[in-house]
Every structure is written in C-alpha cells, then in structure tokens.
Amino acid sequence: MPHSSSNSVSLLVALLTLLGAAAFPSLAAASPDSVRAVAGVRHVDVALMAPQAQKTKSKSATKKKASQATSAKKKAETSKKATPATKKPVRPRPEWPVKGPTPLPGSLLPHKRIVAYYGNPLSKRMGVLGEYPPDEMLRRLDREVAAWSKADTLTPVIPALHLIVTVAQGSAGRDGKWRTRMSDSLIERVYGWAQRRNALLFLDVQVGKSTLQAEIPPLAKFLARPNVHLGIDPEFSMKSGHAPGKRIGSYDARDVNWTVDYLAELVDKNKIPPKVLVIHRFTRPMLTNSKNIRLDPRVQIVIDMDGWGSARLKQDSYEAYVVSEPVQFTGFKLFYKNDIRKKGWRLMRPADVLALDPRPVYIQYQ
C-alpha cells in the first residue's frame, strides 16, 4: 500500500464526519478500514488476466503477470482523494420511486428482481462466477434465487450471470488502454451456462484508459440478444490518467446518456425488449451530474451500491450514494468474503436487504 494511503483515509474520515454525521452515523464513525471498504477500490477486479488466446505464454511471463497483479492489488487499497471539508445542510430525502417512463412490454423492472453472480471464469479472485466449477456455481446461484423467492413471494426472481468482459489492467498493454477484452468464445461459454438456468447474462465493462464508445460496440452481437444486458463500472474509467487501482475512476451523466442511446438503438434495430443497464457506485464522485441522466423506456437503469463492509456501513452507503441521488432503480451488492472479513461482520440476508427503502430490484453476489 502506498505510504499516502493512511493520510488519505484519515482525511476521508474527517470529511465524512463533517458531511455525514447527522444522516449516516456509521459513515461518520467508521474506522479507516471500514471507510476504505466503501470508498476504496474493491481489490479483486484488477486481475491482470491474459486473454484466453494467449494461454501459451511461458511460465516466466505468467509469474511476471502474477507479480504485477499482486502489485496492482496493493495499489487498489488506496482510498479516493479527500476534498476540502465543508459542512453542508442535510438535504431532504428524495422521493421514491422515481417518476420515469411507463415500462414497455417485456420490461423486467420493477416487477421482477434480478439475482446475479458476478465474476470471470478465468479468475477465482474476481467473484463467485469464477470461483467454482460451473455446475457447483449454478447450484449455489439456485440456492440464492430460492432464498430471495422465499423472502419476497410477491416479486418473481430471475437468475443472472454478470460477466466481466472488459477487464481493467495494471499495465498498459500493447495498445496502451490498460484493459483486456475477453474472447467471444469465453462470452459464448458463459452465455451457455446462463441458458442452462434460463438466466440473464450481463456483460460488464471496465474501460481502463479506453472509452465506452470504443468498448461497447464490439459487444453489439451479444447485446442484440434479448436476454443479454450491460454493466459499466466507473471505478475503472481512468479519465484522471492514473493506472487502474491507483485511484477510483468516474463516469459523468454524458457517458451514461451515450450508453443509454446506444442500447436504445439496439433495442429498436433488433426489435427486442428493453435492456437493463447496471452502473456500479460506492462513492459520490464515481458518478457525476447524475441528475442529468436521461431516462428512456427502452433502457432501465440500475445504480448498484457496490461497497463492502459491515451491514451498517453498507446500509448507510446505499442511502448516501444511491438513494440520495435518484436515477431510476436501485441495486445492492453482497460480498461473500469481504462482508465478513472482520469480527462482528456478517453477510446480509435477503430480509436485511429487503428492509432497505427503496427495495433493491437488482442483487449481485461477488
């Protein structure tokens, strides 16, 4: 971890104490490690995985990549840079549900709930999707779907696999974009797994120093399928010029609006039901000018609270970074390992998440 990390975290704790003490007690009282859980990088995403076509590389090259991955993981511990602390009045809580376009026929939300397994089969460290053999992974997903169906009998549950298809890297690569694209064959393989459960497939994009405009169009042939949807991760959109993992990245409303327009055109062109767009978020600067995001009935937007930590910290982060800046629908991420990494922490149960207001309609497990 860089030496500046502890200073950054201390500044962040002070900032949160000033800004959030009244509305979000656990954010204000959090220890540096707990603050990092929500304001820091998620650790496991920057995996420096070689593309599937490059499996023939020498063992020495593989070891070098592993060493780089360890270095990138350590860099990912750094918290976001604190801004000058200015005490602001507590804003009134926005009204939910958001007033938006009437759902079109075939829309999934808000009358269904999506329960997804996140990750990449080339790495056990990036999430549960790649941690287990396919059959076992799908059986575990079945159990979660059953648990959510039991917890909320009025909302049908749809299983999903959330595959990271563009992976941020800790090195520039040949084209200097600091990201690796997964092969079509890998995407087809995971799509096949989803088909075995009549599940959705989400394609998740970490652009590194590339752009959404460059990374999403190559996925068009998959997104043209009615059961394939999209996720975009601001954490690894490095407009600052830093390497992924050194700073938390960001998207602006303009980036989201471009993505919505692109997906809407695909819906019209292919005469398919509306798409779901998942946007990860666990700090305020990750998504700027959210009030300027345009809603379109052909694309349903989910802001997914993506921080790990204690249940109280996650609840307050949901309120601070998702509920307080309404876009359209909400999601909530649960980490099998990071959410229980400290004594006294426990994995939130479906009933715990359903107690949130508004109730998340997209649930992701990593």
Regions found by a protein language model. Give the residues of each.
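Surface-exposed substrate-engagement region within the catalytic domains
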Residues: P51, R247-I363
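Substrate-binding cleft of extracellular glycoside hydrolase catalytic domains
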Residues: A147, P156-E235
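Polycationic, low-complexity disordered segments in secreted or periplasmic proteins
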Residues: A47, P51-P89
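Signal peptide processing junction and immediate N-terminal pro/mature segment
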Residues: A23-Q54
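Hydrophobic faces of well-ordered beta-strands that scaffold small-molecule active sites
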Residues: R113-Y117, P159-L163, L201-L203, P226-P234, ...
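Bacterial N-terminal signal peptides
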Residues: V13-A23
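N-terminal module-boundary/linker segments of secreted carbohydrate-active enzymes
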Residues: K73-K75, K80-D135
